[in-house]
Structure formats: C-alpha cells, structure tokens
Amino acid sequence: MRDVETARDASSGRSEQDKGRRPGRLLAAFKAFSLLAVVAATVFGLMTNGLYDDGILWLWLPVSAVVLALLFVAVLTRGFFEDVPREGWVLVALLAALVLVKGLSMVWTISETETINETLRSATYLGAFALTLAVNVAVPRLGWALVATLAVLLAAYWETPYRWMLLLMMLAAVIGTSAFSRRSTPEEERTGSLVDGLCLPVAAVAGYGLLQKIYPDRYAIGSIDDYRVGSTLGYPNTAAVVLGMGALLALSRMTTLRNPLLRGLYAVLLLGSLLTLYLTLSRGGIWSFGVGLGVLFVLGSGRLQMVANLLLVSVPGAWLWWRMQGLGALLSAEAPMGEKVADGLSLRNDLILAFIVAFALQAVYAYLASRYELTDVSRRLLGIAAGVGAAIAAAVSGWIVVAGSGGGVLNNPDAGGTAAQRLVTLGIGFRADYWRVGWEAWLERPLTGTGAGTFQYTWLENRPSVQGVKQIHNLYLEQGTETGLFAFLAFLAFVVFLVAFTARAAWRRRPDGEGRLLLSGLVAAVVVYLVSSAVEWHWYLPAATLFFFILAAAAARLARAGDPPKALADDHTAG
C-alpha cells in the first residue's frame, strides 16, 4: 500500500513538474517565433527594394503591423522581457523617448501624413529591437536556413498578394520554432547561429548584384545612373552598407569556425560581398566598411588569423579586379548592351574560377591550422610581415587609383567620370545644400523642429535650385531638423551608449574564446551603418534599418552575457 502511495506521489510530482515546464516551453516557442518572424520579414524586405516604395505604404505597412502586434502580445506575456539586461532597458528607453517625441510632433508638424508615417516607422524599429533583445532561445543553422531561404524565394517569385507572403513567412517561423528552437545553449552559440542566418540574405544581395553585371539584359540595374549596382535594394549606397556589414560578419564568423567546409563557404561570401561592394561604387559605403574593419581589428582577437583570411581572399580578388580592368563596359552607362553582355559573360567565367580558388585556399588553410600550431615567435614575425605587406598593398592600390583619377579628388561626384575618379572624389555633391537648409531650419525651431518626416517640405521652401529631395542625407541632423533638440539628444545618446557599451564589453572579454571576436564583428557591423548614416538616408529603407537593429540587439545581449565560466568555455571549445 505504501508502494502504491509512493508511486502515486511520484506520478503526481511528475505531473506538477510537467505543468511547471509547459509555460517555459510555450514562452520559448513564442520567443523563437517572434525572432524568426522579424528576421523573415527583414529578409523579405532586403529582397524587395528594402520595403521602400515612394509614396506607397503597402510595401512596409504590413511588416510594421506584424512587428507591433508581436510587441503588443510580448508586453502582455509574463516573463517575455525578464532576461533583458539593464543596459538593454536603457537603450529601449532612449528609443522609446525618440518615438514619443516624434509622436508628439503631430501637435506642431507641417505635414500630419508624413509625421504619422515616420512615427510608425520608428515604432517598428523600436519593436524589432526590443523583441530581438528579449529573445534568449537558440535556432540552429538549419532553422535559419529554412526561414531565410523561403523568404528569399518568396521575394524572388512572388505573384500572390502581399498579405499571403507574410502568412507564409509566419508559417516558416512556426516550423522553425517547433522543430529547431532550443533554450539551454550559451549566448555565444545562439548569437553565432543568428549571424549564420543573417549572412544568408547578404549572400542573396551580393549574388543578385553580381547577376546585374553578368546578365545586364535580364537583370536590369534600377539605380539612377544605370551602372552602379543597387542589387535587390535598388539604392547602391544602402546596398553597399548591407554588403559591408555582411562582409565584416563573415570575416569575424569564419575566423571563429574550425570546419573547413563552412570556412570555405564564408570565404566565397566574403569575396562576393567585397566584389559587389566595389561594383556599387559607393564611396560612403566603402569608407564606412573601412572604418568598421578598423574597429574589428582593434577590438577583436585572432588578428593574425583575420589577416590570413583577408590575404587568402585577396589573392583571387586581386586577380579578379585585374581582369575587370579590361572589361570597360561593366562600369560604363554609355556602353552598348552587346558589349555589356559580352563583358558580363567574361566576368562570369572569371568569377567562377575566383570563387573556387577562394574556397579551396580557405579550406586548406583551415585544415592545416587545425592540425598545426605556430610558435609565439612565428606568430610575431608573421604578424609583422602581414602588417607590412598590407601597408604596402594599401599604398600601391591608393597610388594606382589616385593616379587614374586624373586629379579630380575634390570634384563633385555627381558630375560623372570613371569609376576610379568617383571612388577617390571627396566632394559631397548636393548634400552640402541639404545640410545647410536643414541646419537653418533647425535654428529657427531648435526645440520642436518642423515635425517628423517633413524635411521634403522644408527643402521645397528653401531650396537654392529646382532639384527635389525628400531626405536630408544625414540621420543625426535630421532628428534635430524635424523633431528638435530632445529627439536629437535621445538618438545621439542611443548611438553613443550602444557603441560604448558593446565596444567596452568586447575589449574586456577574454581573447581565448570565440565570444570576443563574434561580438567585435557585431560592433563593427553596427559602426558601418552608423557612420554611413551621417551622409545617407538608410533610415527610410526599413529592411536595411531592421537589419541594423537586429544586429544591435544581438550585440547588446552578447555584451551583457560576459565570458562563460572557464570550464564551460573549454568544454564548448573541445566539443
């Protein structure tokens, strides 16, 4: 009888334990669902003009509704935000203050419609950032591959109404949640899987950009000048920023991996991203990538390996660039279509060979690095040799480009010229007029501004020419011009706190684990967006900005996680 009671008590205990576990599993599933849905919508947007369509809301409004609906449900769900770090709440509060000021600007705005649009856009970014920041469940690579691939395919071949696209992406998120979500994994592993998933749409952006040059008759370039690659985003400068962010993520991620196959694939992605970045001819994007690369080398560990990875990719990359110099129609708007098609086919053949070489070099290097280890003296000598070689290569490349620019370094980039002349031009073009008009408007209304999203009307009233423009091409000045001092300070505080917090955490981490390098890659990618936004209007292409906020939230979570215990780190590395 006593045995029966004991068995009954044990059964009852298991039942109570299962009941206690069920809410945890449901919460983990909902968190994974939320993150997958946000990422799926972002990937779809990166494939469809960045969710931007001039004057039409249907491209990004459904995504905004989904993100805000998920945020509303998350707020009502107990325990959803319990793992958000203190620093994360500070960042959320600063973004919320920015959204609040933009909403209040409805009282004094000169255009209610534009203010509503901008407030809704900013609220969507806040929602995506908060949701990503709260998610502490892991989705392995297979789950990310499922969701990202389906989103890319739907964007490429969609013929059904937009709402069905979102429903199908939600289905993908549900599948990924039920099949792959895990909670009891280290933060580094969760973030690594997220980075792997986000590199897939970057590969799609790079691939489509290359197709625009390989098959120009089938994949037309939609940019204004008809020869700068805009890829699926349609705007070359924003495409360059996404590619630069992806290249830094690929470089940092491949350095943390040991699998030769994965490292070879990342080498192909890195080469493709850098080549497409060059074909955008975006000075701001390329220089922002350079700044981010410097941040990565300053904060990251394994610098010698990163230099080796870059050198291995630069071997086929330099050969490919040399071959492209004889394909003049690639970067010429006036070239006949027949010449463009012929040069595109030549580029295709060279590109296939370069990708094979990049994959093979990285795979062989990864195999050798896993079997042999250099001594400290050899590392030091190789580091010095690599640094000197990189400096010489940079100096020679700079001299070649400047020599080919014809001395037009300070010319207006809008005046045309060759690709080399455009890349070395320091002029800011019409942006000087945009900034002057915006600054004068801010001085007239320093506390309130003219209303969120209303710069186009300020420009129409004060423009010195007949040229039309909607954005001020400076995200920071735009906050002050449109919504006054308080919005400017809120956004500036968000940027400074985000970069300082994550960079400090990366610098203080142990160099022996993969967490420092992974966090440094995220910080570098975030810096690329923030630096480029000083001369561009990426904020108004929701998909690119959602991509940024997902990375920013991942960096904040990883920064707060800190180093794992030494024994756990050793076990994870050994496994």
Residue ranges and their predicted role:
Residues L265, L485-S520:
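Hydrophobic transmembrane alpha-helices and their immediate junctions
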Residues R218-L249, R253, S332-A354, L475-Q479:
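Membrane-interface segments at transmembrane-helix junctions in multi-pass inner-membrane proteins
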Residues M1-L104, I110-N117, G127-C199, R253-A267, ...:
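Transmembrane signal-anchor hairpin modules in multi-pass inner-membrane enzymes, especially those
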Residues V241-V242, G285-V295, F488-A493:
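Transmembrane-embedded, aromatic-rich helix segments that form part
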Residues Y235, G417-K470, Y476-Q479, T483-A490:
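TM-adjacent membrane-interface loops and short helices in multi-pass inner/ER membrane proteins
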Residues L150-A155, V268-L281, V528-A534:
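Membrane-interface alpha helices of multi-pass inner-membrane proteins
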Residues V43-D53, G480-T483, L517-F549:
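Membrane helix-loop boundary segments at the extracytoplasmic
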Residues Y208-Y219, A395-E444, T448:
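Aromatic-rich transmembrane-lumenal/periplasmic boundary elements in polytopic membrane proteins
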